[in-house]
Regions:
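Membrane-proximal HAMP signal-relay module
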Residues: 1-61, 78-83, 88, 97, ...
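Short helix-loop "hinge" at the ATP-lid/N-box region of the Bergerat-fold HATPase_c
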Residues: 183-184
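C-terminal end segment of the histidine kinase catalytic
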Residues: 251-284
Length: 284
């Protein structure tokens, strides 16, 4: 039963990888198909938006194709293994989880491709509101509580109070979620992640520091490029889109982002966002 939707999704994805943006995943009936249908919708939406772009760079298509191959291969291989009649329940659960994890990675990549495509083609227009940046940072950080507890990572925060910014809160949350995700992903068990928020009259400055593997200056120079992955071993899961998305959002908000890192020491990302002239309850 699992092999049919997996094959349908992988076949369609392969057509898109080869440049056929008219390919679509058909919706499937049954409550247990809901997860596969969501992936199908993401693939269809990506194909629709990519087909609307007048000029697609060859390297972009090649990189999309390359990044899709790994999760698709996992889905295909484990989908085949699930068909074995004598498969134990333990193995069945293990293989199903592998398919779920691979499909989630594929869906995340689709989401980032769509967001980046819209931002680059000015199809997303910022909707600025004035809000407390410290509160947003804390809310975003708390989403990773289970991760830092599981990895026994020490959390240190130094958040200045009453720092207001006028920005698109939803877009800005993408920045923090990507930076926190990277920090926890690259920090080993027992490490440390530090979040600080400071401000001067003009800017709010956010620093996210980890004690992870770090990176060389050569890698740091390219880290905000689409599909660039400093970890060429693929020991950590990623698709090289998150930081490109972060950079684009910060640019749209006329902010600044930089990175400092040292191999086997850790990494610090610094983001500067212009402060709001007035808080939400203040008047001119």
């Amino acid at each position: 039963m699992v092999d049919r939707p997996v094959k349908m999704i992988t076949d369609t994805a392969e057509k898109i990888m080869n440049g056929d943006f008219s390919a679509r995943v058909k919706q499937m009936n049954g409550s247990w198909m809901e997860g596969f249908n969501q992936i199908g919708k993401s693939i269809n939406k990506m194909a629709e938006e990519l087909s609307s772009v007048e000029t697609l760079r060859t390297d972009f298509i090649a990189n999309v194709s390359h990044e899709m191959k790994t999760p698709l291969s996992v889905m295909q291989n484990y989908g085949t293994l699930l068909q074995a009649p004598a498969l134990s329940e333990e193995k069945r659960v293990e293989y199903a989880k592998a398919i779920t994890d691979a499909s989630r990675r594929l869906a995340d990549m689709m989401t980032n491709i769509l967001k980046l495509n819209r931002l680059e083609n000015q199809q997303i227009y910022p909707n600025p509101t004035t809000f407390d940046l410290g509160e947003q940072l804390c809310e975003s950080l708390l989403q990773y509580e289970s991760t830092w507890e599981r990895k026994n990572i020490d959390i240190e925060t130094d958040i200045a109070e009453n720092v207001y910014v006028s920005a698109d809160a939803e877009l800005l949350s993408l920045v923090w979620n990507n930076l926190f995700s990277n920090a926890f992903k690259f920090t080993e068990d027992g490490g440390k992640v530090t979040l600080t928020l400071s401000a001067d009259e003009a800017y709010a400055t956010v620093k996210v520091t980890d004690t992870g593997c770090g990176m060389s200056a050569d890698i740091g120079a390219h880290i905000f490029e689409k599909f660039y992955q400093g970890d060429t071993s693929h020991a950590t899961q990623g698709n090289g889109l998150g930081l490109a998305l972060v950079k684009r959002v910060v640019d749209i908000m006329q902010g600044e982002i930089g990175v400092e890192s040292a191999v086997n020491v850790g990494t610090t990302f610094t983001v500067k966002i212009r402060r709001a002239e007035y808080g939400p309850e203040e008047t001119r």
